[in-house]
Amino acid sequence: MKNNEVHDIKIAVLATVFNRKDVTLRGLQSFYTSVSEMPDSYHFEIYLVDDGCTDGTGDAVMASYPEVNVIKSKGGLYWGGGMNEAWKAASKEYDYDYYIWLNDDAELYPSALKSIFEVKDNDVIVSGVFEDNEHHISYGGKTEKKVLLPPGSKEEVFYMNGNLVLIPRKIFNKLGYIDSWFIHGGGDYDYGMRAKENEFRIVLTNDFVGMTDRHDEKSFYNKNYPLFKRMKMLYSKKNNPAIAFKLYYKHRSLIEAIKIFALRNIKTIFPKH
């Protein structure tokens, strides 16, 4: 084979969705627009988990995008479980060169995929940097003090957001799937930390890859709800402070894990807002 011949690159795109049909369809439309900007040698296959949707999201996806592999579940997988179901289905189907995590609410710019692949490397996870509708950084990567980093930043990424992430086969073969303990939140942070602990790097795209608003509001810190309701929300499957405890214990220290666990409870019991 000649050195200038182009090799086909096969990429599995992983997504999980729950009851936001219109958002999902817009997200997929923006994804395929970005695909159209890529060279013909790049081949994308989407594996999308319908996590027990009752609004017909999965059926709408199959009708609009029959090429998407829709995997229906009974529900209750949340983000981490749903992404792992998609990932397992993809890895059983083919030994892909890359895997992409894609949030269905990510409205990608046409240049998004070009942006993540222009900084690709076999020893690197690429996290796409997003902006909100006021053009402030919303997702991508954070410093150790949880400050969001701008596109192209060379500062070390400590916390990686999972909105649009490119993972090479080499790293997947080393790290495997998302830790099943992190059923919803924390799975992206944990995966990035595991990568760094295995001497891989996390880099950010040089440009914004799309638009998505922050989802920082924690209802269990809202003093307008009665205490019993706040505590119920805090100890729900998605928000249980034991999840954050494990993340900090696993990657930081027991002291920091206890601190974050205690703070979550204190701020819920004595909310400021």
Q: Where does each model-flagged region fall?
A:
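A conserved acidic beta->alpha catalytic loop
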Residues: D50-D59
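Glycine-rich, basic loop-to-helix element that forms the pyrophosphate-binding segment
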Residues: S73-S91
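A short, conserved alpha-helix in the catalytic core of glycosyltransferases
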Residues: V165, I171-G176, W181-F208
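Short beta-strand-to-loop acidic/aromatic patch adjacent to the donor-nucleotide binding site
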Residues: D95-E107
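Short, well-formed alpha-helical segments that are part of the catalytic scaffolds
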Residues: R20-V35
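Non-catalytic, C-terminal membrane-associated alpha-helical segments of glycosyltransferases
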Residues: E217-H273
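Conserved donor NDP-sugar-binding/catalytic core segment of glycosyltransferases
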Residues: E107-Y139
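A recurrent flexible, glycine/aromatic-enriched loop bordering the glycosyltransferase active site
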Residues: V147-I167
